[in-house]
């Protein structure tokens, strides 16, 4: 859900085993910065530090080498540089990512809607899609109010529900694997002007520090597998968040952490293994009709959004 998003514009550091994410994140980052400048959408480019604790230097170096190979700006900071730039930061090494940014997601989405409607599109909110039928002359989308929308081409980008709307004739073998991520806000200022990330962990990028455009700090998200769509943040998780943050910011006051929001990542499994990449499924029907389904659109989906649109357009 785009409203449950940290608003980070990712540089494209992490996705060595996710070719679609890697390509579309790097391309999307440039498109998104250009779009924000063109449309006067609020954004900043504070950069990011990815920090390593003792024994984690090899993983940090592998991320750096991949970034360099892909033309993503990055450099390893020396111990003295870290102490000079962020004296409150605790780590043995850090990677600086200057092209990481933050964006006002609400303004971005509003601008995209304006563009869509200016091009002749009609936005129909609060309409539950019951199914997609490809058996007729046109693809038919059935809504819960009895309406049927027909088109030659349908783009299924329904997030957590996208897999359930893939036409029945498409064999794919994917199943949903939902990962919930919660955020905690911090009640006062933090001594950092850049985003701070630990090294990636299973299921996500670790409990990291993000800043909004007003400088307010949030920590998260964590990652826990869920079977139901529960968006409540558990206050009792505060100590867990505090312990994670204290690894790189020892002076964090756990008492200043409070539940903020939660989101659920629409990840996928196939043959029992997690598929950590964007997936594009296409249903080819007679007469040029088709349904294109966008699956597994979690992070870096926001960063990649305009590049994803380019890719889908090429598929049509």
Language-model regions: role of each:
Residues 45, 78-79, 125-127, 259-261:
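Short loop/edge segments at beta-strand edges and connector loops
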Residues 100-102, 201-204, 292-305:
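Glycine-rich phosphate/pyrophosphate-binding beta-alpha loops
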């Amino acid at each position: 859900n785009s409203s449950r998003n940290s608003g980070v514009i990712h540089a494209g550091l992490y996705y060595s085993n996710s070719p679609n994410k890697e390509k579309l994140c790097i391309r999307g980052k440039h498109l998104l910065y250009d779009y924000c400048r063109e449309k006067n959408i609020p954004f900043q480019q504070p950069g990011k530090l990815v920090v390593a604790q003792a024994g984690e230097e090899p993983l940090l170096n592998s991320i750096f080498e991949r970034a360099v190979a892909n033309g993503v700006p990055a450099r390893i900071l020396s111990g003295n540089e870290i102490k000079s730039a962020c004296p409150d930061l605790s780590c043995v090494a850090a990677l600086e990512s200057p092209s990481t940014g933050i964006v006002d997601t609400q303004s971005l989405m509003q601008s995209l809607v304006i563009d869509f409607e200016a091009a002749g599109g009609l936005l129909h909110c609060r309409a539950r899609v019951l199914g997609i039928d490809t058996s007729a002359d046109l693809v038919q989308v059935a809504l819960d109010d009895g309406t049927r929308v027909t088109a030659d081409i349908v783009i299924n980008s329904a997030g957590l529900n996208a897999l359930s709307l893939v036409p029945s004739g498409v064999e794919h073998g994917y199943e949903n694997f939902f990962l919930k991520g919660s955020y905690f806000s911090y009640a006062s200022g933090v001594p950092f002007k850049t985003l701070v990330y630990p090294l990636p962990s299973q299921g996500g990028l670790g409990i990291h520090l993000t800043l909004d455009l007003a400088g307010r700090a949030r920590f998260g998200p964590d990652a826990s597998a869920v079977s139901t769509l529960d968006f409540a943040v558990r206050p009792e998780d505060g100590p867990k968040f505090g312990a994670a943050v204290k690894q790189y910011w020892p002076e964090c006051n756990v008492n200043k952490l409070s539940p903020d929001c939660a989101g659920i990542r629409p990840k996928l499994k196939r043959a029992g293994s997690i598929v950590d990449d964007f997936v594009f499924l296409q249903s080819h029907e007679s007469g040029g009709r088709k349904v294109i389904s966008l699956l597994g659109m979690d992070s870096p989906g926001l960063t990649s959004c305009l590049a994803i649109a380019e890719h889908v357009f090429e598929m049509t």
